[in-house]
Each structure stands twice: as structure tokens, then as C-alpha cells.
């Protein structure tokens, strides 16, 4: 299998900060396998996230909680191999950093060593700042995540809009400042009001990457299966479908089946 080569320079944590300073928006997308990541990397995507959304997209689970660190490393290793340009981030799965900072550091080191990614991402604000600092002190870039934090879905009773009232908005802003001071290289803001996400982005030096957070963040991220039209029935307000890969694949597999059953594939030119 051959691929086009890319001469684009490797994006790093420092590059992301420079992009924010220059006013250049950051485009991030998820990927979970080598082939998909290679396509995105060659297209010039700025960053690829191996999200724990792999639990839903790749494993068919109802939420992100079941996926293990071994499964995350498996997917992350494949994606990292594919990327020569994109900044590659791996989610730390539920249970890999919540117990204490020492365990968080050990698992972050394991992910970096075994997968070859550029950074790890974990959810939470003030409650994880000590762990974030410890991981960064170990030499590992960290991406933060505030707002809708899917690993806490049971705590909040669903996937609704976060920081809707003044108290929640104040806490989110304060948490963002704490993570900024701790040294995160980027901060995901998920499903929060646009005005709040814009204000957070203005008040911190860290690049913000939004999903359902409006246009005022320093970048955007989407789950690729949703953005490329591969999933059905999931149509939140923030989602735009940029392709209809599901239809392409359905049409393609239909044509393949017809040709096999009609005995028109393979033909003589396709046989040895």
C-alpha cells in the first residue's frame, strides 16, 4: 500500500502556542488506525487525537468508560506510526489517572513509551492539577479538557451543555487558569457557551480547542466518524458533516457484491 509523502514540518507543543499567537486556527480530528491517520496527516491536519471515543466508534460501547489503557495504546501506536506532520495526542482513559498523581504519571509514561505519541490528554480542572503538574514534570506534554467531560457522564447525568450558570462558568474559567498556569500545551473546551469559551481563550495563553464551544476558541476538534458522515443518528447542534463516507462505502460494497455474484469480478485482466 503506497502513500504520498509530505514535506510539512512536524507540529509540536511549541508550534501550537505559536499558532495561537499568530492567530492561526488549529484543526484537530480524531483517528484510531494507521490508514485513516495517514490520510489525515498527508492532508495536512494540524493535530490528531486518539480519543477515548474509540470506545464508542471502534468498540461499540455506549460511553467512553470501558476502554482500557492497553486498548488506547494499541490505537495510539498505529496512529503515531502514520504521522510525520500532525501533533498526536492520546487520551488517558478512565481509571488511569484518577486514583493519585503517581499512578497518573506511571500511566502517562507508559502511553508515551509504548505508543510514540506527542502528548497525553486528561479531563478535569482543579481536581487534576496536581497530576497534570506531575506528568509535565516528567517531561510529558499534557492537553487539558474542561466543560463536558465524557468520563464523568454518570456524575452529571448525561451529555448536556456545561457551564450554563454563573457559578459553573466561573469555576470553568478558574479551572482553565489553573491548567494554564500548570503548563498544559492545549485545552479542549467541550459543549460550553460560545461567549464563555471565547472569554477563556482570551484570558489564557494556552491554545484552546473547541468542540461545541463556538468559533471563539483557538481551534476545533471533531470525531472523524461524525464529521465524515460515517455514523447515523448522532446530530448534535455543533456537528457539521463534511463528507458522506457512509454512502460511498455502502455504494462501493454494493457494487462489489453485485460483481462477485454476477461473476464479473475478477475478470481475466484481474487474474494471474
Regions found by a protein language model. Give the residues of each.
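Alpha/beta enzyme core
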Residues: 2-272
Amino acid at each position: 500500500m503506497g502513500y504520498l509523502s509530505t514535506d510539512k514540518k512536524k507540529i509540536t507543543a511549541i508550534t501550537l502556542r505559536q499558532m495561537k499567537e499568530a492567530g492561526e486556527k488549529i484543526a484537530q480530528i480524531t483517528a484510531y488506525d494507521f490508514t485513516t491517520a495517514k490520510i489525515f496527516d498527508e492532508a495536512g491536519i494540524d493535530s490528531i487525537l486518539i480519543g477515548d471515543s474509540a470506545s464508542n466508534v471502534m468498540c461499540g460501547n455506549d460511553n467512553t468508560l470501558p476502554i482500557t489503557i492497553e486498548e488506547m495504546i494499541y490505537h495510539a501506536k498505529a496512529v503515531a506510526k502514520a504521522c510525520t506532520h500532525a501533533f498526536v495526542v492520546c487520551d488517558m482513559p478512565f481509571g488511569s489517572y484518577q486514583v493519585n498523581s503517581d499512578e497518573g504519571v506511571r500511566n502517562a509514561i507508559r502511553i508515551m513509551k509504548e505508543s510514540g505519541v506527542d502528548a497525553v490528554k486528561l479531563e478535569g480542572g482543579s481536581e487534576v492539577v496536581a497530576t497534570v503538574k506531575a506528568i509535565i514534570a516528567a517531561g510529558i506534554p499534557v492537553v487539558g479538557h474542561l466543560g463536558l467531560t465524557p468520563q464523568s457522564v454518570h456524575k452529571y447525568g448525561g451529555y448536556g451543555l456545561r457551564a450554563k450558570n454563573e457559578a459553573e462558568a466561573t469555576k470553568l474559567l478558574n479551572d482553565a487558569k489553573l491548567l494554564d498556569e500548570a503548563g498544559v500545551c492545549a485545552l479542549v473546551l467541550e459543549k460550553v457557551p460560545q461567549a464563555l469559551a471565547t472569554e477563556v481563550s482570551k484570558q489564557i495563553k494556552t491554545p484552546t480547542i473547541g468542540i461545541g464551544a463556538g468559533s471563539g476558541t483557538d481551534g476545533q476538534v471533531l470525531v472523524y466518524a461524525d464529521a465524515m458522515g460515517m455514523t447515523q443518528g448522532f446530530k448534535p447542534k455543533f456537528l457539521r458533516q463534511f463528507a458522506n463516507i457512509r454512502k460511498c462505502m455502502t455504494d462501493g460494497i454494493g457494487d462489489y457484491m453485485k460483481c462477485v455474484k454476477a461473476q464479473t469480478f475478477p475478470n481475466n485482466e484481474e487474474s494471474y
